[in-house]
Amino acid sequence: MPYRMDRRAYAETYGPTVGDRIRLADTELFIEVEQDFTSYGDEVKFGGGKVIRDGMGQSPIANADGAVDLVITNALILDWWGIVKADIGIKDGKIFKIGKAGNPYIQDNVDIIIGPGTEALAGEGMILTAGGIDAHIHFICPQQIEVAIASGITTMIGGGTGPATGTNATTCTPGPWNIYRMLQAADAFPVNLGFLGKGNASKPQGLVEQVAAGAMGLKLHEDWGTTPAAIDTCLSVAATYDVQVAIHTDTLNEAGFVEDTIAAFKNRVIHTYHTEGAGGGHAPDIIKVCGQANVLPSSTNPTRPYTLNTLDEHLDMLMVCHHLDPAIAEDVAFAESRIRRETIAAEDILHDLGAFSMISSDSQAMGRVGEVIIRTWQTSHKMKVQRGILNPQGNEQKADNFRAKRYVAKYTINPAIAHGIAQYVGSVEEGKLADLCLWHPAFFGVKPEIVIKGGMIAWSQMGDANASIPTPQPVYMRPMFGSFAGARHATSLTFVSQAALENEIPSQLGLQKAAVAVSGTRQLSKRDMKLNDALPHIEVDPETYQVRADGELLICEPATVLPMAQRYFLF
């Protein structure tokens, strides 16, 4: 006789199933399970008296004959493509299969084989996401990487050489020698890393040598002079070598206005950093570019979301980051020109409309490296509270599935696509590197339970190492075995240009991590940004700074209280 479980008992045992809803942290966001790949009555679960035992849910099949290295059981996947309950099989550091795990000798519909060589990780009641991608990193100090991975970030893209004045302000690793040294330093860390060369030059040779040395892209920054000539040259070199260009435009409008910069793009694809403008860019109307089909717009997290504190903290941040002097009136005027409540408020709504495609940090250079994921979901929550259910399909779903998928894409798949690495990372899809985060729903977006890097646990919540069990206080994120020695080399990637691989730069430098080439960056458009491809016509009033999208005024109130904040942190 089959045994019938009530829905609550089932969820407590195997996790939620189709139709169940889950609250994300302490936000007003609720997601609903759309599909369940597991088979009722045939679920696998590890533990004493449970299913994954020899002759039951575990088969005698060797790994060489098809058993996986790691199975995550009964997890709820939240990704841009869906919200589904499934087992996840990981083999050779990659996602092998999303489906039903077990023993094919005694269970039906098994496509993930559990054998004696299979490790088990309980995903019951947990949310599984792709590791985050932060595509706006100032590599000012290596300690950023520890903070980032502890928050759920597994890929970091940007530039810098340490706390040099240039790096403090601009995301560039300038010149072959500096690029070589940073590529060598990348071997020390359990995350995927890629470096952007300096793109500011009106002649190509200085840019070509940086791409050939291993830069995975180029960065144009106003502090180095983002003139129309430099933009044109940089994009021309990028087109030749198939790398992405990121840009921080000319706040002071010295070399031209936003229209001149758009003209210099010549319809070529480009990633615009902090597209609202508080982080830098044509004042007051750089935000217009988010309506251009060739522009891939991102935000940095200090303006995410708009709160009653946002404006006040930005002025001090800006003075420090851009080497400005509060005693010089012109420097103060420069700073004040970038901070506008109207465009920051509009940025919230443009994210909710899918017109802004990505969110990143701007680490230690007007951004917090450990808060990309938190700020993304705080923005989503604020928009739910202020704008209601986001339901463009017009169906009757009461949950926030569409909004959740739109927002998770902003720090996972979309930056991966933008920088030519989506074939490797950026989503929970078969064949990709198993860079994954497991979250307790109550801590979703705030503190991951486990960060898996290339199929191995790299960071995890862990209690007192001298305790008799893993859970006694103090419990906090700590590096695990995947973060050490050769394991970090085997489970992480370094992203470089195809030209660098052809020049055998990785072997010349003795790199231990696998170096892989970015590709497909120059054929992109805004339409390639998953669930974030809207192209509204943006107008900015030059006197009031009011923003309109397709004629509609974009205005919202600042948040006075946010979830995912003091409830979770002592400091």
UniProtKB/Swiss-Prot annotation:
Residues 131-571 form the Urease domain. Its EC number is 3.5.1.5. The active site is at 322 (proton donor). One of its GO terms (cellular component) is cytoplasm. Coiled coil: none annotated. It is an enzyme of class 3 (hydrolase). The lineage of its organism: Bacteria, Bacillati, Cyanobacteriota, Cyanophyceae, Nostocales. Keywords: Cytoplasm, Hydrolase, Metal-binding, Nickel. It is found in: Cytoplasm. Ni(2+) 1 binds at residues 136, 138, 219, 362. Belongs to the metallo-dependent hydrolases superfamily. Urease alpha subunit family. Gene3D superfamilies: Metal-dependent hydrolases, Urease, subunit C, domain 1. It comes from the Bacteria. Binds 2 nickel ions per subunit. Its main location: cytoplasm. Its cofactor is Ni cation. This is Urease subunit alpha. One of its GO terms (biological process) is urea catabolic process. Substrate binds at residue 221. Heterotrimer of UreA (gamma), UreB (beta) and UreC (alpha) subunits. Three heterotrimers associate to form the active enzyme. It catalyses: urea + 2 H2O + H(+) = hydrogencarbonate + 2 NH4(+). Ni(2+) 2 binds at residues 219, 248, 274. One of its GO terms (molecular function) is urease activity. Pathway: Nitrogen metabolism; urea degradation; CO(2) and NH(3) from urea (urease route): step 1/1. Carboxylation allows a single lysine to coordinate two nickel ions. The modification N6-carboxylysine is found at residue 219.
